[in-house]
A protein has these predicted regions:
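C-terminal and inter-domain tail/linker signature
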Residues: 1-171
Length: 171
């Protein structure tokens, strides 16, 4: 039996610019499930989930955490970030917030992940960036491929709950 902090498989860290690395990523169960606001459905399997999360983290310019750690049997993360925009659409990036719930199985492996990105327009942009990167690697219906530019809400939703970030520029 492994613990929630024990490494069973090491993922490729595509986001070395981020100070925080979630070690539960290196302990994905073979049948792990990833659900999130950026998906129209869910991803299953350690290889698929690992590939998705490893790349998705690379889209963050920074992560400012309000909280991360164990709460009972769950691991929780609450953070804000900035994701890159496109050349024609918010090239300086878009503010995005995420609340993550990590569930563990009886063996201590990461068995389910629920990621709640907000606001919706930023989550849809994030989904479209994932779609553009992965192409047909995953079912295209898993991602949003429409235009969010007319509906983008790009303002601070933190209500002062996050510390000011010194990481404001897209690298």
């Amino acid at each position: 039996m492994t613990t929630p902090h024990e490494t069973t498989r090491k993922l490729d860290n595509q986001a070395p610019h981020l100070d925080y690395y979630p070690h539960w990523l290196d302990n994905l169960a073979d049948d792990v499930i990833l659900q999130g606001a950026v998906f129209n459905g869910e991803l299953r399997g350690a290889d698929n989930v690992g590939k998705m999360l490893s790349f998705a983290r690379s889209l963050y310019v920074f992560q400012d955490f309000r909280f991360y750690g164990m709460r009972g049997d769950l691991f929780l993360e609450d953070y804000r970030s900035r994701i890159r925009g496109t050349e024609a659409y918010h090239p300086d990036g878009v503010e995005i917030y995420n609340f993550v719930v990590v569930y563990f199985n009886d063996e201590g492996e990461t068995s389910q992940l629920v990621m709640n990105h907000r606001p919706q327009s930023a989550a849809l942009l994030f989904s479209s960036l994932l779609s553009k990167h992965f192409g047909d690697v995953f079912d295209p219906s898993l991602f949003y491929d429409g235009d969010v530019s007319a509906h983008l809400l790009d303002r601070d939703l933190s209500r002062g709950k996050f510390p000011p970030s010194s990481h404001t520029e897209v690298g």
